[in-house]
Amino acid sequence: MAEHACPYWAAYFLANRLRKLLQNPHKILAPYVRPKMTVLDVGSAMGFFSLPMAEMVGPGGKVVCIDVQPGMLTVLQKRAVEAGLAARIETHVSTEDSVGLHGRDGTFDFALAFTMLHEVGSQTNFLREIYRLLKPGALFLLTEPIKHVSQAEFDRTISLAQQEGFVVTSHPLIRLSRPAVLSKPSPES
């Protein structure tokens, strides 16, 4: 587990009703997630964003959930079954160095990395891997927590993303977060 990874037990505090008031997954994701999409939730933990995305993609869509901690994914799978969304959820254990989705290049319509990038060993490698996994024209919502990541650190992360080929499309307002929406340009762009 990464040195700064959110401990398994703390994730229960992150998946609560108060957080839904401050960071409503449906409101945050509505501009980006559509029915029948294949989306990637990196650092999914127990599914605070994964389960709402599974609702949003509908029966023809898929949410691939990645986390470095198997226990998080076990709880996520249980919650997906309870919500009747298990068929739309696929889980994978990552490593500190890799998302680990080999053979899936260019298959994702959208990716989310919500307040987790500061936990990875190499941001450059992570961003390169996400770029590779996205379809041309796909969007990537990247956020970092304002209490753990300074604006200067976030700006450096965005600069790394741009060096990997991402284009910044917007900075939506998301409480308690430093957000950026990045796109993987289409060949005709």
Predicted regions span which residues?
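Conserved alpha-helix/loop element of class I SAM-dependent methyltransferases that forms part
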Residues: 19-36
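A short acidic, Gly/Pro-enriched loop at the edge of an enzyme's catalytic core
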Residues: 34-37, 97-110
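Conserved SAM/SAH-binding beta-strand->alpha-helix loop
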Residues: 69
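Conserved SAM-binding strand-loop segment of SAM-dependent methyltransferases
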Residues: 85-97
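A short SAM/SAH-binding and catalytic strip from SAM-dependent methyltransferases
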Residues: 109-121
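A short glycine-rich, Lys/Arg-flanked "PGG" loop and its adjoining helix->strand segment in the class I
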Residues: 124-136
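Conserved beta-strand signature within the Rossmann-like core of class I S-adenosyl-L-methionine
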Residues: 137-144
